[in-house]
Amino acid sequence: MGVQFSAAELTDLVGGELSGDPGRLVVGARPPEEAEGGDLTFALDLHARKLIETTRAGVAITPVRWPFEHLTQIVVANPRLAMAQVLAHMFPQPIAMPPAGIHPSAVVHPSAVVHPSASVAALVYVGPRAAVGANTHLFPGVYVGAEAVVGSECLIYPNVVLMDGIRLGDRVVIHAGSVLGSDGYGFVPTGERHLKVPQVGTVVIGDDVEVGANVAVDRATMGQTEIQAGTKIDNLVHIGHNDRIGRHCLIVSQVGLAGSVKVGDRTVIAGQAGVANQTTVGADCLVLARSGVTKDLPDHSKVSGFPAQDHLLELKQQAARSRLPQIVEQMRQMQRRIEQLEVQLLGRL
């Protein structure tokens, strides 16, 4: 049996209000519909009431106290925050880490500097004059190019490519298959062909950034492509050359940012949205899913649609578009009635 946690211990951890048996023990955490008696489960909002009513979990973290006597409840103001705190406490290391040191099959250039506490797993390549910081884990198949710098306490998952000269801060997480520092998309038409523009810049990633799986972050044409501290990027996102992403932004899956885009702090860009070349999105903005941003947005904007515009205006236009068939039919009826009236009027002259 794994480590057991009491309801009282978890209540103290999240600062909640306990309703039920403080000695109730849990050893795992599962969604309400999958949970068993030894599991903790979560109701992230009031819509989860029916799931909690029928769950077989022993303990549930809930936003309010519900009259369900079959389980112990820990009532908190922010269940999602409590879930993050509890899961980190119950599962401090959910993925097995490679041991410290350099695996015999890894290739580390003699001029590279790898901290003794770092782990360099099987088939990793670390290039000339590259640096890997303390307690950083490079999983199998990672490529670290020449003069690239990886900070301390980073997690670089399998088959990540960190091209020459890019710089990662501390506590950066890069998930499997992502490529940082590939060439930006730069070509000059010359009539019969497209001449490649050399991409001689770099990529700089701030502290506490997390990059999902299969993300591409292009190096700058000149200067740097930058993702600042605390920003979280979902899977399958493209960050173009010379983009500058602010602090603590959220960029959701399948977003595409063209070159030289600037995004302000704490902005959220939802799934499949696109931002046009050389566009600035201000701070604290919300770009809703599948939006197409074609012009600069001021701070605190909330936009949707293509081209992206104020969300309320977009909703009104969508509502109006849904009524177009009815409006067209009404116009046709009015036109026929006008024609009839014209005939009647002419007949009286």
From Swiss-Prot:
Family matches, as Gene3D superfamilies: Hexapeptide repeat proteins, MurE/MurF, N-terminal domain
InterPro entries cross-referenced by the UniProt entry: Hexapep (IPR001451), LpxD (IPR007691), Trimer_LpxA-like_sf (IPR011004), UDP_GlcNAc_AcTrfase_non-rep (IPR020573)
UniProt-recorded name of the protein: UDP-3-O-acylglucosamine N-acyltransferase 1
Statement: the UniProt record of this protein carries the keyword Lipid metabolism: yes
Pathway: Bacterial outer membrane biogenesis; LPS lipid A biosynthesis
Annotated keywords: Acyltransferase, Lipid A biosynthesis, Lipid biosynthesis, Lipid metabolism, Repeat, Transferase
CDD domains xref list: LbH_LpxD
Pfam families xrefs: Hexapep, LpxD
Keyword Nucleus: no
Bilayer-crossing regions: none
Reactions catalysed according to its record: a UDP-3-O-[(3R)-3-hydroxyacyl]-alpha-D-glucosamine + a (3R)-hydroxyacyl-[ACP] = a UDP-2-N,3-O-bis[(3R)-3-hydroxyacyl]-alpha-D-glucosamine + holo-[ACP] + H(+)
Known function: Catalyzes the N-acylation of UDP-3-O-acylglucosamine using 3-hydroxyacyl-ACP as the acyl donor. Is involved in the biosynthesis of lipid A, a phosphorylated glycolipid that anchors the lipopolysaccharide to the outer membrane of the cell.
Superkingdom, taxonomy of origin: Bacteria
Gene Ontology, cellular component aspect: carboxysome; membrane
Single annotated GO MF: structural constituent of carboxysome shell
Subunit: Homotrimer.
Active-site residues, record numbering mapped to chain: H241
Family classification: Belongs to the transferase hexapeptide repeat family. LpxD subfamily.
Documented EC number(s): 2.3.1.191
Enzyme class name: transferase
GO biological process: lipid A biosynthetic process
